[in-house]
Amino acid sequence: EKMAILKNRLKALPEVEEATYGNANPISSWGNGVHDDNEKLIGMLRMFLADSTAMKMLGIRVIEQYCEPAYGKIWVTEDAKRAYGISAHKPWFGMRMQDGKHEYEVCGVIADYHSGDALSENEKTEHNAIGVITPQQGGWVVLVKTRGDHAQALQAIRNTCKQVAKELIGVPAEMEAEYLDDTLKNNLKDKHNMMVLI
């Protein structure tokens, strides 16, 4: 798999402390609906997919664990736990599906965290969650934790991505690589510039 080659090559860099799969991140999460048994939308989950390594890299703390994390299950925040009445005796929520299972099966509870950019706020019916992926599923994003000089590490990552792209697809394509902190700063700057223009 091409992403595995990229992940392993990045992980081998001296500037990289850890590299693992993720599909999106807390800043660029997406919305998944929560429905009652009549299929009425009752809430929204702001989600991204991550494995346990990515969760540790992002500083996400597990509060309770109900079962082994497996693909198809989710981690919910303390806020979502309260909103949907989740417990060790009721580790599910959402409408009942045709196979008898519920829309969401919960493997555990994580500490509340902020999703979206620095100014984003969840609506009253929006809650955060992380879908479980395992190293076998892979992902479309490689999350990387660096060490040492940030600019030097970023350049090493970009060079490696370009080199791997050339080896795999024949073209030294640029890949998007940015620190989450920089993404947040740029979002704030963009919002500030927009306010100044208005």
Language-model regions, residue ranges each:
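Structured, solvent-exposed hinge/loop segments at the ends of secondary-structure elements
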Residues: 1-84, 88-90, 99-102
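"Rare, low-scoring activations can occur
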Residues: 2-18, 71, 78-83, 88, ...
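A glycine-biased structural micro-motif
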Residues: 92-94
